[in-house]
């Protein structure tokens, strides 16, 4: 049996989107969702495959997959393969082989420490493209001076009879109109509009596959929400879409995250992944000086595309550890071209 390649087809406009887009067949998304629920090898970011804006390459066993998007002659995988650890290297190699046979340039975007073994085995060259914020839940508490601001916001919201409700996949549709309103209000004040590829967007077919956390007033009115990226082995849980409405009280996101951290710890998760700050912490390096200089420049001056520095400031208030995130590619593949095309995929979702 050979690895299966699931390719997108053109679908009509759907709720939460501004235009038609290429999307993977629903059956393939269901397969990917099942693999995610059983995976022994995955990061929370692997859930971005459910966006439907990437192609899926399945392993011969059907127990693993890799998601990627073509842009020009570049094929960009988002993150590492997902599924069974023993299949990861073989599936990554299969992706490279298929891309080369079709005249494309393969690369892996947004990979972290879990990708080290694959990069070494396949002799891939890496360049840093950002940092990921990780909060250790095994030692987390709201005690101490470091957590004073977050603790104050939490206590005030509890006093004012707010609560956080965390529900499994399928909870979105019952509150769709309100969640859409919150999303629309939030987007008015954000640089660059909706994203894609490795960053979630408000698409009911995507967010309804994820656990949903909502902040509610005493009368049930929703003030804010966040979509969660779980991992089957409970090593980490992450957050993707997080938005609040115009009538949300000050500090509502601090309150939401405080409750999420406490809930995730009680559920047995080891760490909370606050997701990647693109281009953060990138310094010039001798192996790819042009790429790293460009990344640093974009981080410092690219606020119209993405609120790079604002995102990092928000995450820093929780005092996470920062781990490096890379773009990895075989020799002969331009990191500059791959990074430029990844930026286009993120900022111009299909």
Residue ranges, per PLM feature:
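N-terminal alpha-helical membrane-insertion module
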Residues: 1-6
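A conserved beta-strand-loop-helix scaffold within acyl/acetyltransferase catalytic domains
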Residues: 16-76, 104, 109-126, 138-153, ...
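Glycine-rich phosphate-binding "P-loop"
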Residues: 76-86
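A charged helix-plus-loop insertion that forms the helical arch/lid used to bind
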Residues: 126-132
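Short beta-alpha connecting loops at secondary-structure transitions
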Residues: 296-300
């Amino acid at each position: 049996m050979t690895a299966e390649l699931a390719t997108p087809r053109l679908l009509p406009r759907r709720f939460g989107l501004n235009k038609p887009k290429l999307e993977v067949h629903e059956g393939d998304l269901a397969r990917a969702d099942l693999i995610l629920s059983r995976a022994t090898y995955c990061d929370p970011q692997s859930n971005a495959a459910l966006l439907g804006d990437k192609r899926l390459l399945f392993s011969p066993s059907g127990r693993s997959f890799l998601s990627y998007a073509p842009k020009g002659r570049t094929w960009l995988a988002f993150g590492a393969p997902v599924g069974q650890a023993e299949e990861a290297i073989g599936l990554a190699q299969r992706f490279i082989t298929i891309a080369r046979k079709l005249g494309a340039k393969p690369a892996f975007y947004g990979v972290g420490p879990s990708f080290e073994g694959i990069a070494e085995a396949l002799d891939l060259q890496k360049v840093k493209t950002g940092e990921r914020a990780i909060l250790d839940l095994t030692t987390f508490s709201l005690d101490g001076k470091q957590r004073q601001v977050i603790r104050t916001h939490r206590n005030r919201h509890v006093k004012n009879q707010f609560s956080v409700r965390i529900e499994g996949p399928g909870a979105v549709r019952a509150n769709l109109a309100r969640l859409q309103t919150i999303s629309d209000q939030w987007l008015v004040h954000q640089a660059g509009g909706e994203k894609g590829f490795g960053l979630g967007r408000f698409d009911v077919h995507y967010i309804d596959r994820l656990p949903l956390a909502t902040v509610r007033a005493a009368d049930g009115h929703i003030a804010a929400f966040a979509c969660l990226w779980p991992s089957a082995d409970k090593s980490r849980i992450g957050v993707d879409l997080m938005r609040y409405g115009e009538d949300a009280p000050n500090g509502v996101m601090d309150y939401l995250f405080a409750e999420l951290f406490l809930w995730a710890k009680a559920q047995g998760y080891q760490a909370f992944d606050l997701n990647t700050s693109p281009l953060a912490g990138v310094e010039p390096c001798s192996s790819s000086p042009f790429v790293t200089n460009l990344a640093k420049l974009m981080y410092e001056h690219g606020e119209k595309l993405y609120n790079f520095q604002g995102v990092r400031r928000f995450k820093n208030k929780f005092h996470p550890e920062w781990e490096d995130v890379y773009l990895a590619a075989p020799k002969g593949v331009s990191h500059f071209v791959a990074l430029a095309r990844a930026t286009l995929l993120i900022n111009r979702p299909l």
